[in-house]
């Protein structure tokens, strides 16, 4: 796996699923391929994106700044600086300085990532802030190692929290989660269907599913009534794709 592929993988792992994730993935691909060279416009676009947490925006801003060639005097962005200040905790800053000194001795991406993984996400973000604010310099490869270690820490905690929700025995939470998943699947179906004639059927199924979820929420239904909703939708989507000549076995 190439270095940039690895960086893209780690960074996207902390971005919530949805149309915005696809957009960010495209931007990262363009940046890494050298197709997008306007850092100013890129940062302005990133700053105004909804849904993303300040830290995620900070990490993406850091990656864009590392990758896109820019004039030396280009102003650092406040939204990135604020996100990478380790919550203003002096403890994080102390650890960040220690980590920075260790990173200075590293020359490889994997070496830097290994060193960084033993620190908390707050200290890692502060260390990124040091480099972003030009208080310290490391090679791009080492900086990417730091980015990936930070994303791994964040993705780990997100995964734990997600697993807790998926394995919860509370029927109300499970019910709501199934309805949310069915709703987002329906939305994705509508987007994929496009405007072809054969799409009418898929659109109809998606629309009915969304109306059903809306009705279930309005009148309040038994928690088990949502079981299988998303799977039914995905089966419909696969059947539609088969007719369109598209075979995607790994949807579930």
From Swiss-Prot:
Keywords on record: Host nucleus, Membrane, RNA-binding, Viral matrix protein, Virion
Motif interval(s): Nuclear localization signal: 101-105
One biological process term in Gene Ontology: viral budding from plasma membrane
SUPFAM superfamilies cross-referenced by the UniProt entry: Influenza virus matrix protein M1
GO cellular component: a single term: host cell nucleus
Keyword Nucleus attributed: no
Membrane disposition: Peripheral membrane protein
Superkingdom, natural source: Viruses
Chain intervals for the UniProt region annotation (Membrane-binding): 1-164
Gene Ontology molecular functions: RNA binding; structural constituent of virion
Subcellular localization, as worded in the UniProt entry: Virion membrane; Host nucleus
One of the Pfam families matching this protein, by short name: Flu_M1_C
Residues covered by region (RNP-binding): 165-252
Family per record: Belongs to the influenza viruses Matrix protein M1 family.
Subunit note: Homodimer and homomultimer. Interacts with NEP. Binds ribonucleocapsid by both interacting with genomic RNA and NP protein. May interact with HA and NA. Cannot bind NP without genomic RNA.
Record's miscellaneous remark: Most abundant protein in virion. When expressed alone can form virus-like particles in transfected cells.
Function as written in the Swiss-Prot or TrEMBL entry: Plays critical roles in virus replication, from virus entry and uncoating to assembly and budding of the virus particle. M1 binding to ribonucleocapsids (RNPs) in nucleus seems to inhibit viral transcription. Interaction of viral NEP with M1-RNP is thought to promote nuclear export of the complex, which is targeted to the virion assembly site at the apical plasma membrane in polarized epithelial cells. Interactions with NA and HA may bring M1, a non-raft-associated protein, into lipid rafts. Forms a continuous shell on the inner side of the lipid bilayer in virion, where it binds the RNP.
HAMAP family the record matches: INFV_M1
UniProt-recorded name of the protein: Matrix protein 1
Organism, scientific name: Influenza A virus (strain A/Swine/Wisconsin/1/1967 H1N1)
Gene name, Swiss-Prot/TrEMBL: M
